[in-house]
Amino acid sequence: TVQYLLKRTLPQGGLAPGDFVLWHAAAGGVGLIACQWARALGLRLIATAGGPEKCRLALAHGAEHAIDYRAENFVARVREFTGGAGVKVVYDSVGKDTFEGSLDCLAPLGLMASFGNSSGPVPPVAPALLASKGSLHLTRATLFTHIATRAATQAMADELFAVVASGWVRISID
């Protein structure tokens, strides 16, 4: 999941070292891999998590900043961390509860990458909303599109195993 999001689900012009991204639910299994891989790519990952312990976990795995969404306004904190500029991409597995706020975290021309709906599905979106918030882009990424061919699946797996073998990403199984 992290491979196809960080390497294939990208804003206009891609991502470069120093770019800010926001990752919701960053203290889960996928999120902790994302924190590490983003750091390896030189990205400045802002994590959201539920509670101080989960925020510390995201920071320990490479997030530059962590926001306790239960106690803090994540939109205000993202704007603070980015000097008001916003992030290039929001990676969101939460869905309904974070969708509108996530759009407000994006820089103009930013990408909202929805890949889950743990809080429920996002309601229908009027395209004019994306225009009014800065000509934003929206995608609903799914693994099956990215592994449609054996060659694509192998290339993605090779990249994952390489980043794990390099030591940049450590996968914990509890």
Where are these predicted regions, by residue range?
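Mid-domain Rossmann-like dinucleotide-binding core that forms the NAD(H)/NADP(H) cofactor-binding site
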Residues: T1-E72
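Terminal peptide-recognition signature
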Residues: V2, A38, A58, V90, ...
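N-terminal Rossmann-like NAD(P) cofactor-binding module of classical short-chain dehydrogenase/reductase
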Residues: L22, I67, K88-Y91, A113
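Short, well-ordered alpha-helical microsegments
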Residues: G31, C55, V75, F99-E100, ...
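Glycine-rich phosphate-binding loop and adjacent beta-alpha segment
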Residues: L41, D97-V169
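Alpha4-beta5-alpha5 "output face"
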Residues: L59, R79, L130-A131
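Short amphipathic alpha-helix with an adjacent loop that forms part of the alpha/beta core around
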Residues: N73-G84
